[in-house]
């Protein structure tokens, strides 16, 4: 049964899961919605509160993460079109797979793949926990900036097949963390890059088909991950720790 479930997860591709061209359209609309905003100004206490392990908020260039779509805008309406489409066509198996990823950490997203040849070594777990701290700090800060409610809180017709999680919606923390981990792993295991990025895309899509995130939330999470990884690679402490994790793969 475990092998059957794993094959199910790996067999899901982003293309196969997309409802018509809607989700792709939502991503295209997000990228075409105008010049991204400058990183918001924050006070010193706010910056300290949003600091992670390797990164500090004031060091981040957040312009790659577009502002949340305005309520009632073309992008916002497309979000709900896609959400309703998924609500009508999602399967029990897809909802079950999405529920298995309610947590957001390395083991949830990539642990089953046993990329280290067995159980994840404690040092690797600690490394990804530290990276997760940077991801969480950044997405929580941006959620506080944009204050976009969850889709089911905005439209009573949205019926999630996942628990109605608390908190704000934009950007998706699950999407940001899954992609950030995938980018790191793809650098460590370049031959498996396509598989790793597809798994991150799948994890993001689970949040949409489950009814707890708008498509543009997940697209923004991915953009945030790209920005975070760019900054992480500039940090000597991160590079040193990444080198140590790379040695665990040999």
Stretches found by the model and what they are:
Residues 1-6:
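N-terminal secretory signal peptides that target proteins for export/translocation
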Residues 27-210, 237, 249-250:
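Hydrophobic alpha-helical bundle signature of multipass membrane enzymes
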Residues 202-233, 240:
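Interfacial helix-loop-helix junctions of multi-pass membrane proteins
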Residues 245:
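Extracytoplasmic/periplasmic copper-protein system
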């Amino acid at each position: 049964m475990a092998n059957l479930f794993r094959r199910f997860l790996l067999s899901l591709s982003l293309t196969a899961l997309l409802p018509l061209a809607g989700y792709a359209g939502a991503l295209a609309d997000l990228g075409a919605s105008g010049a991204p905003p400058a990183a918001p100004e924050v006070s010193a206490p706010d910056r300290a509160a949003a600091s992670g392990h390797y990164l500090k908020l004031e060091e981040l260039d957040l312009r790659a993460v577009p502002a949340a779509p305005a309520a009632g805008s073309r992008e916002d309406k497309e979000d709900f079109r896609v959400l309703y489409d998924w609500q009508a066509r999602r399967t029990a198996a897809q909802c079950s797979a999405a529920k298995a990823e309610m947590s957001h950490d390395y083991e949830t997203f990539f642990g089953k793949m046993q990329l280290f040849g067995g159980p994840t070594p404690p040092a690797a777990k600690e490394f990804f926990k530290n990276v997760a701290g940077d991801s969480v700090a950044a997405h929580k800060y941006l959620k506080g900036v944009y204050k976009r409610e969850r889709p089911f809180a905005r439209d009573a017709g949205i019926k999630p097949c996942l628990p109605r999680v608390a908190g704000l919606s934009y950007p998706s923390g699950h999407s940001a963390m899954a992609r950030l981990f995938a980018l790191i792993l793809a650098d460590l295991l370049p031959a498996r890059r396509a598989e790793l990025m597809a798994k991150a895309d799948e994890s993001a899509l689970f949040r949409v088909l489950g009814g707890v995130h708008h498509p543009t939330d997940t697209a923004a999470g991915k953009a945030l991950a790209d920005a975070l990884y760019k900054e992480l690679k500039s940090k000597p402490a991160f590079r040193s720790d990444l080198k140590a994790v790379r040695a665990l793969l040999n």
